[in-house]
């Protein structure tokens, strides 16, 4: 993504010009009029920290270079009490986790037992992120390939996410559905309709600004998804490198 375009998009988000507060059911039409100003905090994925340091020193490093939080894969392999201790000693937040089973065992899989495995995994992630003091679990809703037709994936993914509603209500945590290169939910209109079909205030979209550049424009998705966006991922991406 060109730096200028990214800055413009980020500025639009920061001023709250397109994202309204996440306060009402998604079936309600949302105004694009400016609302309250939003403050964006910066975090990074734990796997991005390549330095050979102790857990606490990794947290300190992240703090020293100006980030606010760290995102872990979940279910988490590190004991939660160690993460909480490092959080409390450094002030680094643990606002969200990425479920690590949604790709290898998709919520859209034709096999009901595979879907149930990841439903249970996401339920555990919701409990973990609550204990860590966060509020969101990133979930890829489905995968389409030569063995899983689009319509089958859509039906199964929708059914699976709906089965997670009792878990988000029990924990009070959010699920953010993310756009990845999974051949599934390829337009902002479809993403909006998918979220609206679930129609739950704790289930929204974890929008990846970089991923979408493969087949779209971030500003289109931001405008269409609006208050359905719960968190953002950003990365460097070059259409020139992709095409060449």
Segment roles from a protein language model:
Residues 2-130, 200, 204, 214, ...:
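N-terminal pre-domain/capping segments
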Residues 10-12, 16-22, 34-36, 108-207, ...:
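Active-site acidic/histidine proton-transfer and metal-coordination neighborhood
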Residues 180, 210, 218, 235-237:
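Histidine- and/or cysteine-centered catalytic micro-motif in compact active-site loops
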Residues 220-223:
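Bacterial c-di-GMP phosphodiesterase catalytic domain signature
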Residues 240-244:
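Short, intrinsically disordered, charge-balanced linker/junction segments flanking boundaries
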């Amino acid at each position: 993504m060109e730096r200028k375009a990214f800055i413009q998009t980020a500025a639009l988000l920061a001023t709250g010009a397109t994202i309204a507060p996440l306060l009402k059911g998604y079936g309600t039409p949302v105004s694009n009029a400016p609302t309250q100003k939003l403050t964006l905090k910066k975090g990074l994925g734990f796997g991005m920290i390549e330095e050979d340091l102790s857990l606490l020193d990794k947290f300190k490093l992240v703090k020293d270079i100006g980030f606010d939080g760290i995102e872990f894969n979940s279910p988490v392999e590190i004991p939660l009490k160690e993460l909480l201790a490092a959080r409390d000693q450094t002030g680094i937040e643990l606002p969200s986790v990425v479920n690590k089973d949604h790709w290898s065992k998709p919520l859209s899989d034709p096999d009901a037992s595979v879907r149930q495995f990841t439903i249970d995994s996401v339920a555990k992630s919701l409990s973990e992120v609550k204990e860590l003091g966060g509020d969101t679990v990133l979930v890829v809703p489905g995968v389409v390939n030569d063995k899983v037709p689009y319509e089958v994936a859509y039906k199964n993914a929708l059914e699976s996410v709906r089965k997670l509603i009792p878990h988000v209500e029990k924990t009070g945590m959010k699920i953010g559905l993310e756009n990845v290169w999974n051949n599934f939910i390829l337009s902002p209109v479809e993403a909006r309709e998918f979220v609206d079909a679930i129609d739950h205030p704790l289930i929204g979209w974890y929008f990846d600004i970089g991923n979408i550049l493969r087949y779209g424009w971030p500003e289109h998705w931001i405008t269409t998804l609006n208050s359905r966006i719960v968190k953002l991922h950003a990365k460097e991406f070059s259409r020139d490198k992709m095409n060449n």
